[in-house]
Amino acid sequence: MSNKGQLLQDPFLNALRKEHVPVSIYLVNGIKLQGNIESFDQYVVLLRNTVTQMVYKHAISTVVPARPVNFHPDAEATTS
C-alpha cells in the first residue's frame, strides 16, 4: 500500500485506539467483529474484546466506530 493511503488510515485508527472507542469491523466475507483497537501496523489490526484477535487489513471491508471520532489527517494530505 502506498503512503498516501496511510495518511487517512493511520490517524483514524490511532484516534480510535487512543480514545478507546468501541468499533465494529466488517470483513469482506460479511463477518462482524467487535472490540477496541489495541494496535495496528501496515498489514494488521489487533482487536481486543475477551481475547485479542489479529485481523489482516486486506480482509477488512468497513470499520464503524460506536460514536463519532475527531481525527485530523496530516496537513500534507489536504494540501497535496
From Swiss-Prot:
GO cellular component, one term: cytosol
Keyword RNA-binding: yes
UniProt GO MF annotations: RNA binding
GO biological process terms on file: regulation of DNA-templated transcription; regulation of RNA stability; regulation of translation, ncRNA-mediated
Residue intervals of the Sm domain: 10-69
Keyword entries, A-Z: RNA-binding, Stress response
Cited InterPro entries: Hfq, LSM_dom_sf, Sm
Assembly and interaction partners: Homohexamer.
Family that this chain belongs to: Belongs to the Hfq family.
Protein task: RNA chaperone that binds small regulatory RNA (sRNAs) and mRNAs to facilitate mRNA translational regulation in response to envelope stress, environmental stress and changes in metabolite concentrations. Also binds with high specificity to tRNAs.
Protein name, UniProt field: RNA-binding protein Hfq
Source organism of this protein record: Burkholderia ambifaria (strain MC40-6)
